[in-house]
């Protein structure tokens, strides 16, 4: 199911680091941008990596656990927001236009049947998950199928010359599934990794935590088996994003991880295949409390902290600008010798 993840290219990494030391600036003066450029080289295997073709892949799926009152918004908003994406009217569309990135929308588990149209990939594994408070959200086979969808979508994008990919999501109730995954895989109590999602009040938050506790008690997901956790308390769109991560890493494409939902997918992916970790770039620190726990567990430092909690891939696409800047610095700055500028003595 999982393609072989190639190791980082240490020669390209060393060449990029060496070039950074010759550019017309004090070594290390551009901080994280220099680190990013070296990481891009190691991932892509190119000492002078380019970031031209960019895309955000949005996996969409519904959650049966919404029936427990864990979301401030109704389940039908998943379908409605997918249509909004297709019309170009969502936050991710505006930000992707600014970043000159494509928006790829994938129905991997929307409860409603969507009509075929340009810009939408119909790859439905199921009409949403089942209510995880009563039993497994999906079967293990369904989780594997959704992962395969994500990998296949990236395969198609890679054939177009994709240089950089962001993970995006749409699914009412998916912060509940993500919190359950985080609790199961980190061992943290649900209260420590569960936030207000799209805007729950105090009573709603307490109900959400109780539902997650019940789901974990009912399903007993095995923390030693991330696929078991994913299938029992996860979501189809989260599984799809696991596949996006695997597919990108297999093709040496850097993966920009968005917020809490994408972080949960990254936690599962890294639990299944540790070798994906170096391919991940954490875009931002989400307001969702569990996101910090996930990033710490993955050993990732976010590039941005803007108080975001929307999802859709918005934070990841904002980070595209910094990542492209890192590549441009490495590729376009002159060396001391080229510029005729004296280096330090």
Predicted regions span which residues?
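N-terminal loops that bind phosphate or other acidic moieties
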Residues: 1-345
